[in-house]
A protein has these predicted regions:
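Select transmembrane alpha-helical segments in multipass membrane proteins
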Residues: 7-17, 80-94, 126-130, 185-198, ...
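Transmembrane alpha-helical segments of multi-pass small-molecule transport proteins
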Residues: 12, 45-46, 113-144, 157-165, ...
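Helix-loop-helix connectors at the membrane interface of multi-pass transporters/channels
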Residues: 76, 103-126, 159, 214-218, ...
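Hydrophobic transmembrane alpha-helices that form the core helical bundles
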Residues: 31-35, 53-131, 135-139, 144, ...
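A generic transmembrane alpha-helix motif of multi-pass inner-membrane proteins
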Residues: 165, 358-359, 385-439
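TM-loop-TM module centered on a large, flexible mid-protein loop between adjacent transmembrane helices
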Residues: 73-76, 80, 112-116, 227-289, ...
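Helix-loop-helix junctions that connect adjacent transmembrane segments
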Residues: 2-5, 40-41, 115-122, 150-278, ...
């Protein structure tokens, strides 16, 4: 059998990209967006354009970069080892925060599924338990985790795609219109408030080109698949969250901790709603399981490069970085306690805004370095101009996302970033001293 026959085509890669992008990030979004109103559809459209630009630019980064380390390697083209460190550091921190938010999503759906009412402290404690359970289950290595995650992802995809297709039968256009801007917030402010939540659903787009080696004619097909996959995910996100807004009354939706389960209960009955909640809990935990291992691998890779402490690269006989996983989960435990809020939704919102801010920093570093990356790899002039322009659009959107995340998220995000620069000072001798001596 030839090597070419083992390659996947552009349609297959488009579907794969779309499925990989559709994780557990969406399952709490209808609630958050209901707090703003159906005007949030404008935020979805803005984010769809911005995310597509970012995904396309990252596809080009992945295709042409000769440096390892993902976004850190891209950033190094312009910002040297300091940029590489900061991209890895802020990305790692964002994943630590994001996983805590995913755990809270699982707790929210789980409490609704079991009919339990949780106090703020109980929410934090159950979140901590969920995080540690996912960590312990990862001690067996990546293979089991990968198999479970590839199965449980369908617990999100089936309900989300399903409601996008059949939900229109129960859609009430008058309810949707009346929910447009229930609190009469100024239009620009209302759109901005929703931006970080809509971007949250697309986090992970930076890995859109991860399957480039398995594709026929990657230089042509990978960008097409990335654009198609990102736009496809955007359509499903926009349709699913907006159709729910025409099925469930705005006030009820805004106070729910399991919006998709609530929507299916309105469409059918309580039993179906419970089944959907169960699927979402399963999917959320499966996603958490995979991401907890991924975070440990990100920290392990950074430790191997000399950026993070050496204990992060210690692995067991099953290649599981247990010391790193335990350290990361201890940080998440602290984060869960520090962000205790009056309600589960408020705690989720705080974590999402902070995760988005810290995740956008490596996005900006990568976009800013793309021009140098393309020049260094002698990319054709027309492709260079197109890609740099698209990266500029992605950068503008990223800056807007930072602004829209709010003062609190920007304050904490800035502190996290300044801590990063301080930490780099303690490891920079490994890189910058060698450079000075060479000169």
């Amino acid at each position: 059998m030839s090597a070419k026959s083992n390659k996947i085509g552009v349609v297959q890669l488009t579907i794969l990209t779309m499925v990989n992008m559709m994780g557990s990030g969406i399952i709490m979004l209808p609630t958050k967006l209901a707090e703003i109103g159906t005007i949030s559809i404008v935020s979805w459209l803005v984010t769809a354009v911005g995310s597509t630009a970012l995904a396309y630019a990252f596809a080009q980064c992945g295709m042409f970069s000769k440096k390892s380390g993902g976004m850190g390697g891209y950033a190094e083209y312009s910002f040297g080892k300091a940029g590489n460190f900061m991209a890895n550091y802020t990305y790692g921190v964002s994943l630590v925060i994001a996983n805590t938010a995913i755990a809270i999503s699982a707790v929210g759906y789980g409490s609704e599924f079991l009919g339990a009412t949780l106090s703020p402290l109980s929410i934090a404690l159950w979140t901590i338990f969920t995080l540690w359970l996912a960590t312990v289950l990862n001690f067996g290595g990546a293979r089991i985790t990968g198999n479970i995650s590839s199965f449980t992802i369908w617990g999100v995809i089936i309900p989300v795609v399903g409601i996008s297709i059949i939900g229109w039968k129960w859609f009430d256009s008058l309810m949707y219109v009346n929910s447009w801007n229930p609190h009469n917030v100024p239009t620009f402010e209302a759109i901005g408030v929703s931006i970080s939540m809509t971007l949250w659903a697309f986090l992970g787009l930076e890995s859109a080109c991860a399957n480039a080696d398995a594709v026929e004619n990657p230089e042509k097909n990978v960008p097409i698949a990335v654009l198609g996959g990102t736009l496809g995910a955007a359509v499903i996100y926009i349709v699913s969250t907006n159709v729910i807004a025409g099925i469930v009354p705005n006030l009820e939706l805004a106070n729910s901790t399991a919006p998709f389960g609530l929507a299916f209960a309105h469409m059918f009955d309580e039993t179906i709603g419970k089944v959907i909640m169960g699927l979402m809990v399963m999917s959320c935990f499966g996603s958490l399981l995979g991401w907890q291992f991924t975070i440990a691998q990100v920290f392990k890779s950074s430790a191997e490069e000399g950026y993070f402490p050496a204990f992060f690269k210690k692995v067991t006989s099953k290649d599981a970085p247990i010391v790193g996983m335990v350290t990361i989960t201890a940080l998440q435990t602290l984060l869960s306690l520090m962000t205790i809020s009056p309600s589960l939704n408020k705690q989720f919102n705080v974590l999402v805004d902070l995760a988005v801010v810290t995740n956008v920093i490596p996005y900006l570093l990568s976009m800013a370095a793309l021009a140098v990356l393309l020049k260094a790899e002698n990319v054709a002039p027309q492709k260079y101009k197109t890609t740099v322009f698209v990266a500029f659009i992605g950068s503008l959107y990223s800056i807007y996302a930072l602004y829209a995340a709010g003062e609190q998220a920007m304050l904490y995000g800035s502190i996290v970033t300044f801590i990063g620069w301080t930490l780099y000072g303690f490891v920079s001798y490994k890189f910058d001293l060698k450079k000075s001596q060479a000169n």
